[in-house]
Every structure is written in structure tokens, then in C-alpha cells.
């Protein structure tokens, strides 16, 4: 399968807890004043680490002692996502992890614990592909995530944040005082993903690429017959200096996005991240091919259990309106409580064209394929 890394700057905001000039450093070691949190199946041990200062070591545990299949809804339940600021989201990190009917992680527990590493078992980050899940760790001070394996989308979201991911043997080495070359954390990835991770995540990488501080690896595929999708990608390759590029299954490339869209559950973060990374004067190229929709939370304030979040939901709507006014993208806001339509359907009908490369924040974005677009 062709591996595509999208060239966007909308996934994460970067701020550093560690006193280093650049993250990640060339050599990775544990900070003397930070801690390691083990998410054990014995939840009382988790409580003792959070509230009683208990420190554990991987040498004294096995992978089987650790929680498997940690769901993103455990990390950031849907109600947590009504906040758009990752620093606020982090205050309710792991709010969905319950024991005997009450939260294991009280508000600010992960932030106040002084942790820089978090450790779990197999398949970390299953479930919904929400970016807020790794954000809740990142903005709690976590910079290294240890697991036996990761759910693919969650792994990509961590990578976009510049979070280093490793295994339990690497953690043993770190806890025994070893400094590990960052290449051991990044070496298993394709060349483009390595660049993103070694430059601190998607936002700083994109900024350095734009400023000419990062060179993309050459597209190495020789001239060959290509499928329709491969031709779409080859026509939009970055870093080929005007030359014709050929791609094949397994290549990792950067391709220029033609258009996209967002909805009120996610646009607030887009506006916040772009403003902080590029300044308040940032612009969106070709705004007629981008759009915002009010459809996901249209009826949320009429649902009794969401009533207490009404103010936060309105903030999400207001920030989407601010983004639209700032960028001039297409506006599909509701009028008198009536939405123009569902985002992935309206986008396909009105502005996705044949041959477009579309990126959007809705899980049904791939509907654009019905218009012979790569979405």
C-alpha cells in the first residue's frame, strides 16, 4: 500500500516541559526530577503512583502486568473534547478510567504527578481516532510513550505531536541510567515520518520545511505505469523541483493537499494551533476549496446530559466562526437551527473535484472517492 504523509499544520501545538533546546534531543535519557507512570492492571497501584508517590521499575514488572487495549475514550471521553485547549484537556486526562464507579485519575492527576513517561501493555490507543487522546498526555508533561504495540492511528497522532514511542526493553535501559540515541526511537519509521518525529512533530517540521531548513528525501521510484490514485499523488508531490515523479506501493511521500473541511467539534483546535505556530496573520491558500460545517453538535445543547457543556459547545461554534471569518473558507453554518447538510456529502456535491487530494476531520471523508478524488 502506498504510504502518504499529508503536509498540513493542523494537528498539534508544540510547547515544551523539558528544559532542552530542542525536542527530541539526539540522546534520550530520563530527567532526574521527572517520573515514570505504569498503567497496571492493578488499578490500586496506579492510584498509589498518582497520589502516594509510589515509583515502580520495569525490572520488577512484566508486560502482562500492564493494561492492554487502552481506549482513546478512556484517555479523553467525548465530554472532555468539548474543551479545545490541550492544556485544559490535559486536566481531565484518563477521565474515562474508572474503578468501582469512580475515576482513577482525578482532575489534574497526570499533570501534578510529575511524569515524563507513561507505560502500558499491548495495542495502546484503540477505538476512536481522536487527536485529543495523545494531547492529554503531551500537555501533562509526557514525552515518551512505552507500549508493546500501538493502534495505527494513535501511533500516527503521537508521531505528529513529536512523542517518542518505544518498548519495554528500552524503558529498562532508560531506568538503568542509559542514554539512548533518538534514532532507536525513530529508525523503524519511513524516511518522511522519521523527519517529522526528529523535528519535533508535524507543526515544527512543516514550518522548517517551509523555511528551507529541512530537505525531503528524493522520490526514488523509476518510471513505471501507475494507477489512477498513484497518478493523483505523483501530480502533487512536494520536493521534486518540477520534475515528474513516479510512486509505487510502499513509498512515503509528501503531497500537496487541494482542499478539505472541518466541523465545529474540531475547527477550534485548527484555529488555535495555526495562530500559535504561524501568528495571527496566517492564511489558508485557496480558501474556496476549504470549508467549515456546523453539523456534529447541531442538536447537542438540546440533549439534557449535555446541558452543562452548553457554554463550551457555544465556544466551539464561536471559534469556528472566527476561523471562517479569518480565512474566508466556505461557510456551511446552521441558520435558525438548520444545517446546510452533512459535511462529507455536501463537500462531495459542491467543491470536491475529480483528481483532488482532500484532507478533512470527519471519519467519512473517504466519501470523496465517489467523485474520483483521493480523500
Q: Where are these predicted regions, by residue range?
A:
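Fe-S-dependent hydro-lyases/dehydratases of central metabolism
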Residues: 1-375
Amino acid at each position: 500500500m502506498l504510504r502518504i504523509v499529508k503536509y498540513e499544520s493542523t494537528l498539534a501545538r508544540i510547547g515544551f516541559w523539558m528544559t532542552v533546546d530542542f525536542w527530541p534531543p539526539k540522546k534520550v535519557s530520563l530527567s532526574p526530577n521527572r517520573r515514570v507512570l505504569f498503567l497496571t492492571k492493578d488499578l490500586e497501584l496506579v492510584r498509589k503512583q498518582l497520589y502516594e508517590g509510589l515509583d515502580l521499575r520495569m525490572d520488577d514488572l512484566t508486560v502482562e502486568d500492564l493494561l492492554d487495549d487502552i481506549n482513546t475514550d478512556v484517555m479523553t471521553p467525548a465530554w472532555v473534547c468539548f474543551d479545545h485547549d490541550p492544556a485544559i484537556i490535559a486536566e481531565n486526562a484518563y477521565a474515562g478510567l474508572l474503578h468501582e464507579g469512580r475515576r482513577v485519575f482525578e482532575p489534574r492527576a497526570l499533570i501534578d504527578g510529575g511524569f515524563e513517561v507513561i507505560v502500558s501493555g499491548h495495542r495502546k490507543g484503540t477505538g476512536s481516532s481522536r487527536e485529543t487522546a495523545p494531547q492529554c498526555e503531551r500537555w501533562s508533561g509526557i514525552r515518551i510513550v512505552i507500549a508493546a504495540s500501538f493502534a495505527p492511528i494513535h501511533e500516527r497522532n503521537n508521531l505528529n505531536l513529536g512523542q517518542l514511542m518505544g518498548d519495554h526493553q528500552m524503558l529498562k535501559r532508560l531506568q538503568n541510567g542509559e542514554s539512548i540515541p533518538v534514532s532507536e526511537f525513530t529508525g523503524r519509521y519511513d524516511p518522511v515520518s522519521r523527519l517529522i518525529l526528529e523535528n519535533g512533530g508535524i507543526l515544527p517540521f512543516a514550518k522548517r520545511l517551509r523555511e528551507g531548513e529541512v530537505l525531503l528525501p528524493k522520490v526514488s521510484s523509476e518510471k513505471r505505469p501507475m494507477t489512477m490514485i498513484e497518478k493523483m499523488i505523483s501530480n502533487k508531490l512536494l520536493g521534486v523541483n518540477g520534475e515528474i515523479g513516479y510512486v509505487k506501493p510502499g513509498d512515503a511521500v509528501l503531497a500537496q493537499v487541494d482542499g478539505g473541511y472541518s466541523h465545529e467539534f474540531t475547527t477550534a483546535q485548527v484555529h488555535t494551533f495555526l495562530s500559535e505556530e504561524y501568528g495571527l496573520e496566517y492564511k489558508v491558500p485557496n480558501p474556496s476549496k476549504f470549508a467549515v460545517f456546523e453539523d456534529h453538535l447541531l442538536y447537542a445543547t438540546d440533549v439534557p446530559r449535555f446541558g452543562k457543556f452548553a457554554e463550551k459547545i457555544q465556544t466551539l461554534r464561536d471559534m469556528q466562526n472566527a476561523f471562517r471569518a479569518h480565512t474566508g473558507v466556505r461557510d456551511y453554518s446552521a441558520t435558525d437551527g438548520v444545517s446546510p447538510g452533512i459535511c462529507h456529502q455536501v463537500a462531495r456535491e459542491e467543491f470536491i473535484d475529480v483528481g483532488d487530494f482532500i484532507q478533512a476531520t470527519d471519519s467519512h471523508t473517504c466519501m470523496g472517492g465517489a467523485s474520483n478524488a483521493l480523500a
